[in-house]
Amino acid sequence: MQKHDGEGKRPLREKVVRSNCPSTSSVTAGASVRIAEFLSPQAIIADMQARTKPEVLRELSGALVRAHPHLQEEKLVEVLREREKLGSTGIGEGVAIPHGKLAGMSQLLATFGVSREGLDFEAIDGKPTQLFFALVAPENSAGVHLKALARISRLFKNPRFRASILEAPTAADIHALIVQEDARP
């Protein structure tokens, strides 16, 4: 039986994916993805102001544009909104991973935000969401995109790690914690 991409349309092949991005330039079908390769400290919001789901998507998009000025905020917001229409990316335990694919991108990019109060993001467990990890990938990057989503999901399943992120006061502290936890085997 042939393996297919996330949409079940194109067969997956064991090959090296090439691009100008460190996150995809040497990723093979079996290689692991490291979050530090696509999340910069400048794209982290230590204390989000958003109070609604649309505001979260806009605030995360704005942070990504500030870190990567070549991106267009409205396009990012629209991509994330369209994905949310398919079903909430609130995975539970206070975590959401809004994500989407954007034409014209050459690399995988991410932004992360902490809502100290938490808000309703229509998470699968019905609990307020406090940790938002948004991921935007090039249009044809199914393998790397899915590996990154899996890596983020695994990382944020750890309750002690989630608690340490909520206690971190600055974007630099949050980034350091994510990089440290992501480096563990």
Language-model features and meaning:
Residues 2-185:
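Cytosolic covalent-transfer regions centered on His/Cys nucleophiles
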